Design a protein with these regions (language model features):
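N-terminal hydrophobic or amphipathic helices and topogenic motifs
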Residues: 2-110, 115, 124-132
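Rossmann-fold NAD(P) dinucleotide-binding segment
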Residues: 145-148, 156-193
Length: 284
């Protein structure tokens, strides 16, 4: 049976429906604003008790519950999960204004290379966590001896090509200072740090770039060096920031990174070979 096309004004029929949609969208905005206020309060509580920004079990349980609710309500569960994940990413932003200090507030952290892109990211994180942060660069290296004195942490955040050279040139560090690095290879830098400093040493590799908005859910590889009990506060600080920590020996880390790099180069080679075979015009 053919449907009869209405001769009524379509805009007159659509208008009340669109008004209902506008009202519902407005309510959504109000609900999101209320949720943001609650998550900001959650952030303050987490800061008070030194709790991690990201708790995977809580996030997974929340998504599972809302997916089930969506299915019961006849709404796409995938849609609800997509919306929730975007909302949760925003909530991490609202919780990141300040963090608890996992050592003593005001303790000194020296970031060698802190004016660089990744170094700046960690300077900001430590400052927002209540640490006194100083940046050591080539142009103020003459102050290195005074700067590292009394530091809780000396963090190496320089280009990989000069990492071991910079470590070797560090002045003597206090016995309770933690020496750590952020280099993307671990065997060489970790060996250099162990040779330079007789106390606590740990290798770190943040698996992200400096352009991220926050480090919640970002992976950081930890390669233990020496006196792990002395840098547990640093490990806890990364957890408070929301990072996901995974432990690998320096050798394991570098072997895996070589495999990853090989796959990246292989992918680029395959793409290039395919473009050449197709005689693609790269100008277009």
């Amino acid at each position: 049976m053919n449907k009869v096309v209405s001769t009524e004004d379509p805009m007159a029929a659509l208008l009340p429906l669109r008004q209902q949609i506008d009202q519902l969208d407005s309510q959504l905005v109000e609900l999101l604003a209320k949720r943001a206020a609650v998550t900001a309060e959650v952030g303050r509580v987490k800061q008070q008790y030194a709790l991690p920004l990201y708790v995977p079990e809580r996030e997974q349980a929340l998504i599972k519950a809302r997916r089930q609710q969506a299915e019961e309500a006849g709404v796409s569960a995938d849609l609800i999960e997509d919306v929730l994940r975007r909302v949760m990413r925003e909530s991490y932003q609202t919780q990141e204004a300040g963090f608890v200090c996992c050592r003593t507030s005001g303790d000194k952290v020296v970031v060698v290379g802190g004016a660089g892109a990744l170094g700046k990211r960690f300077v900001s994180l430590f400052q927002r966590s209540g640490y006194q942060v100083e940046v050591l660069e080539q142009d103020n290296w003459h102050q290195a001896k005074d700067m590292v004195q009394g530091a809780a942490l000396v963090l190496i955040a320089v280009p990989i090509a000069v990492t071991q050279l910079v470590i070797a040139q560090l002045p003597e560090l206090d016995s309770d200072t933690v020496l750590a690095d952020l280099t993307s290879t671990k065997t060489g830098p970790l060996s250099a740090m162990l040779a330079k400093h007789s106390s606590a040493v740990v290798g770190l590799h943040p698996m992200f770039g400096p352009d991220i908005s926050n480090i919640a859910k970002q992976v950081v590889v930890v390669s233990h060096g020496r006196d792990a009990e002395k840098y547990q506060w640093l490990i806890q600080q990364f957890k408070v920031w929301g990072a996901v920590l995974t432990e690998k020996s320096a050798q394991q880390h570098d072997e895996l990174m070589q495999l990853i790099q090989a796959m990246r180069h292989f992918s680029s080679l395959v793409y290039g070979a395919h473009l050449a075979e197709e005689q693609a015009d790269l100008q277009q």
